[in-house]
Amino acid sequence: MSKRNIIWLLMAFFFIADLAAAVHKGKKEVVLSEQSLRDKVKGAWAGQTLGCSYGGPTEFKFLGTIIQDYIPIPWDKHTVKNWYDTFPGLYDDVYVDLTFVEVFERCGLDAPVDSFATAFGRTEYPLWHANQVARYNLLQGVKAPQSGYWKNNPHAHCIDFQIEADFAGIMSPGMPNQAAEICDRVGHIMSYGEGWYGGVYVAAMYSLAYVSNDIEYIVKEALKVIPEESDFHKCMSDVIRWHRKYPKDWKRTWFELQNKWSEEISCPEGIHNSFNIGTKINLSLIHISEPTRPLYI
């Protein structure tokens, strides 16, 4: 494990030592053993890294459509290393997270937004869309949270914070409201509105996954941190409803989703293209996944 991940693992242990959280269905107390905690933290980071690698061959290639079942997706024991060696930018989902994790390691759990923004602004790794504009804004003197505000960042509703909010949930086991608070400090550096809601929702699901293995419960419970009047909440609620209506046919749900929610103006590069980078439409794919095959959709 890399030095960064070791630091992060230790942080998680200190943060939730002797965890006892009443968050599950029956409001019963939930206690995590150190071994269970360690396994879940490692699994969270491994899952994120493997997910980036698995999506590498198809990213931005099947726009506005599904990947047909007969399309093979190559995978072997060398896949992760090959992608990292040839296109490390594929892992922006991971290295942006680690930038914020290092701020917590240096400044503590009460680190202010300026500390995160400064660290993010000093990075030199590849960035795109909301992240790229946010870093440019910071370097031009536009401070957070204005760096992510939609009037200053035309990509504010893009998927950026959604793919890098994992850390907030990983370090808030069983505490989705705490995950949302971390997102409030960090997420507005590059995102606003739906772009921010996507990150909060992902973080909340990570948080709840520490104390429940019930996917339906996690998906529904995490949605409570999102305002009901928002389009984001309405879209996710639709997907939950369609999945209940077509439990064995995720493709039918996908078509319903496209029919109602695929018109987006959230990304300047994608306004006239089937670009698939709007936050709502991407996160909804989590919901229509079959529990054992989420990466295939």
Task: Describe the predicted segments one by one.
Residues 100, 119-229, 237-241, 263-264, ...:
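Amphipathic alpha-helical interface segments
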